C-alpha cells in the first residue's frame, strides 16, 4: 500500500482523548501516516504535550492558535489541510480510536472524485442509526475495553453482514487534498463550529463527488468531547450512559447561529437520508412581502428568504435597526441589504405575500418546506395557498453557485 494519509486533528482542552486517539493511530496503523495537530488555545497542557510528542514522532506537524479567542475546527481543519504534506487528508476527531486496518479499508476505495468514510462504533449516548454501530466499549479512556472492541471488529468483518459499502458521509472521512481545495474547503460562515460539515457535504454532492462508507474499516468514537458536552459522560447505577449536565451554553448559542446561517445560505434545514447522504432541495431566489411584521417576527422570517419587504416606519424602524445591529454580529451575510421597505417593488424570482398576524406554527411550515414545495408543484404565475399569495416569475435555481467557497 503506497498511499498515505495526513490525519487532520484539531483539539481544544480534550487532552486525554487526544492522547488516547494518537496512541491508537500509532499502535494500529503504524508511523507511516502523517498526523497534523492544531491546538485551539487550550489551557490543559495540550500544546506542551503536542510539542513534546512531535520531538519523538517525526511524522507529526503542529500549529497553535495563540488566542485569546478560539478559532474552532471550522477554521483549523483548513489551516491543517494547508500544512499537510500528503496527497490524501482525513478529517479526524480527537475522540476517535483507529481500529486495525481502518486505513487500508478506506484507501481501498479512495480515488479522485470520491470521499470515503470509515464506520463509527459508538457507545449509546445518541440515538441509533443504520449508518453506525451502537455498542458500548467504554465512555471514557479510563474504562475503554480495547480487547473486547478488537474482538468485535474481527468477528464483524469475518461475518457476512450484507454490505461492504453504503453511500453517505460522516467523520472520519478521507479525500484527495486537491479535491478538497477545489471547492474551497470549509465555509468560515460557520466558525467556530456547527453545520460546517453539513455544508461541505452538500457541496461535495453538488460537485459530483461520490460519497462512500466502508463497513470493513472502523473507529470507536466517544462522541462530542469538545465544546458540546465538555464535561464528559457518566453511568447511572444501572450502567446506562449519559452526558454530564447538558449541552454547554457555548455550544447551544453557536449551534443556533450556525443553523440560522445554514438556512440563509441554502434556504432549508439540513437534510440527509438514513445513511447520512445529503438531500439537497433547490435554492430559489425568494422574497417575502410581509404585512404587520414586528421585530420578533422579522427574526423568525429573515433567514428563510433572500429579501424581506415590510412597513418599518416609526417604532418599527428603531426595532429594525436594532435587529440589524445585533444580527450582523453573527453572520457574514449583509443583513441590511436583505431588508427593504414595502414601497420597494420586489425583485425576486419568487415572491410570497402574507400577513404576519395570521402566521401559525402550522402554516409557518410552508416557509420551512418552501424549496421542496416549489420543486414539486411550483409553476410560473400567480397562486394562493392558505394565507400566502405567490407571484412566481421564474423557477431558476442557484444551489450550484454555492459549491465553491472562496477562501
Predicted features and spans:
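Short aromatic/hydrophobic "clamp" motif used to bind/position activated sugar donors
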Residues: 89
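A recurrent flexible, glycine/aromatic-enriched loop bordering the glycosyltransferase active site
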Residues: 75, 153-178
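Short, acidic, metal-binding catalytic loop of nucleotide-sugar glycosyltransferases
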Residues: 23-32, 300-307
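A conserved acidic beta->alpha catalytic loop
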Residues: 39-48, 97, 313-318
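Glycine-rich, basic loop-to-helix element that forms the pyrophosphate-binding segment
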Residues: 66-84
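A short, conserved alpha-helix in the catalytic core of glycosyltransferases
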Residues: 167-184, 190-218, 223-224
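Conserved donor NDP-sugar-binding/catalytic core segment of glycosyltransferases
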Residues: 96-142
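A conserved hydrophobic helix/loop-capping motif in glycosyltransferases and polysaccharide synthases
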Residues: 5-21, 28-29, 38, 109, ...
Amino acid at each position: 500500500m503506497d498511499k498515505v494519509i495526513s490525519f487532520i486533528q484539531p483539539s481544544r482542552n480534550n487532552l486525554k482523548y487526544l492522547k488516547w486517539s494518537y496512541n491508537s493511530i500509532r499502535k494500529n496503523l503504524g508511523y507511516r501516516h502523517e498526523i497534523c495537530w492544531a491546538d485551539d488555545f487550550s489551557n490543559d497542557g495540550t500544546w506542551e504535550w503536542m510539542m513534546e510528542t512531535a520531538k519523538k514522532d517525526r511524522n507529526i506537524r503542529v500549529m497553535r492558535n495563540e488566542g485569546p479567542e478560539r478559532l474552532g475546527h471550522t477554521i483549523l481543519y483548513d489551516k491543517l489541510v494547508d500544512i499537510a504534506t500528503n496527497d490524501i487528508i482525513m478529517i479526524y476527531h480527537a475522540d476517535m480510536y483507529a481500529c486495525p486496518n481502518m486505513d487500508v479499508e478506506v484507501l481501498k476505495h479512495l480515488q479522485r472524485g470520491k470521499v470515503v468514510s470509515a464506520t463509527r462504533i459508538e457507545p449509546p449516548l445518541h440515538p441509533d442509526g443504520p449508518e453506525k454501530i451502537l455498542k458500548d466499549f467504554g465512555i471514557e479512556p479510563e474504562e475503554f475495553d480495547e480487547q473486547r472492541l478488537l474482538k468485535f471488529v474481527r468477528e464483524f468483518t469475518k461475518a457476512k453482514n450484507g454490505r461492504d459499502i453504503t453511500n453517505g458521509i460522516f467523520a472520519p472521512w478521507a479525500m484527495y487534498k486537491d479535491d478538497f481545495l477545489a471547492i474551497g474547503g470549509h465555509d468560515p460562515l460557520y466558525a467556530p463550529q456547527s453545520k460546517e460539515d453539513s455544508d461541505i457535504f452538500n457541496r461535495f454532492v453538488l460537485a459530483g463527488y461520490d460519497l462512500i462508507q466502508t463497513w470493513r474499516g472502523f473507529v470507536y468514537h466517544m462522541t462530542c468531547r469538545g465544546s458540546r458536552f465538555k464535561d464528559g459522560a457518566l453511568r447511572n447505577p444501572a450502567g446506562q450512559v449519559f452526558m454530564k449536565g447538558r449541552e454547554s451554553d457555548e455550544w447551544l448559542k453557536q449551534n443556533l447561529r450556525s443553523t440560522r446561517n445554514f438556512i440563509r445560505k441554502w434556504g432549508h434545514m439540513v437534510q440527509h437520508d438514513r445513511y447520512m447522504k445529503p438531500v439537497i432541495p433547490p435554492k430559489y431566489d425568494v422574497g417575502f412581502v410581509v404585512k404587520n411584521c414586528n421585530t420578533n417576527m422579522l427574526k423568525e422570517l429573515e433567514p428563510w428568504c433572500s429579501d424581506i419587504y415590510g412597513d418599518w416606519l416609526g417604532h418599527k424602524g428603531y426595532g429594525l435597526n436594532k435587529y440589524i445591529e445585533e444580527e450582523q454580529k453573527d453572520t457574514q451575510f449583509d443583513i441590511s441589504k436583505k431588508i427593504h421597505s414595502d414601497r420597494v417593488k420586489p425583485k425576486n424570482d419568487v415572491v410570497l405575500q402574507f400577513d404576519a398576524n395570521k402566521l401559525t406554527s402550522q402554516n409557518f411550515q410552508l416557509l420551512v418546506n418552501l424549496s421542496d414545495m416549489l420543486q414539486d408543484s411550483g409553476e410560473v404565475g400567480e397562486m394562493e395557498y392558505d394565507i400566502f399569495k405567490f407571484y412566481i416569475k421564474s423557477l431558476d435555481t442557484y444551489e450550484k453557485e454555492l459549491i465553491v467557497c472562496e477562501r
